[in-house]
């Protein structure tokens, strides 16, 4: 507070402009070091960034608290990042659903059959249904049927997206005899970790396939 008072006393109504565009001028104020000035500038830029992001998300009825959460993950580059691929919100931010990301994407002109939409939809289906059923995977045919219905797209693009997600390592496939079980990588790794801990605790010494 004392520092802010000194800045306003020195630069008056130009104080914010000086901080944003010519913050080295703050060295004229006694007691302010270069590192302190850098901290002031970073805090200022962050506040401006948060305000812009809150306003950007306001038109999509995303709460300020969720907007701040997005900022904490993606930083000052949030807006162009979201404009480039709104589905990262559903993929990476707790509390922002696929439907909300889809609404933003449609308003930005994304195609219903775009890969990023189908891929995000598939991941959201696995998360949602796995959570409801208490499993960490879904059978591949179930994912395909759910995605075709939810996304209103043909089966071919859904199968292509699953193949691409498997290639990129975002999904993991395990053959269960009658079907392939599809996991989100995060769920798969978590399940293996739990299994390995249980084996260590039991003293059994065989490998997990």
Give residue ranges: language-model regions.
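Accessory alpha-helical DNA-binding modules that contact the DNA backbone or grooves
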Residues: 1-180, 197-201
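ASCE P-loop NTPase motor cores of helicases and related translocases
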Residues: 178-209
